[in-house]
Amino acid sequence: GKILNIKILDKTWIIQIKTSKKFNKFLVEKASININGVSLTVSKKKSKFFEINIIPHTLKLTNLKNLKENDLVNIEFDIFGKYLHDINN
């Protein structure tokens, strides 16, 4: 995925990430997602991107504090989203 935008709201980072459209079917709001090996929650899903929120404690303990706009990140989707897709198809 690609970092589109990083906003900081009360020390929490809100990051918008764009991914290939072919992977959108695996994104589920409130489900888990791994970004660069860190397990997080999808806070919002839109047609062209999704958002994650990162609290200060997580930023302190991970490599995510080094992210900036236009960076590429490794994404691993929650198995729940994959199962949901399979059930509906």
Give the location of each predicted region:
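Conserved loop->alpha-helix
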Residues: G1-N89
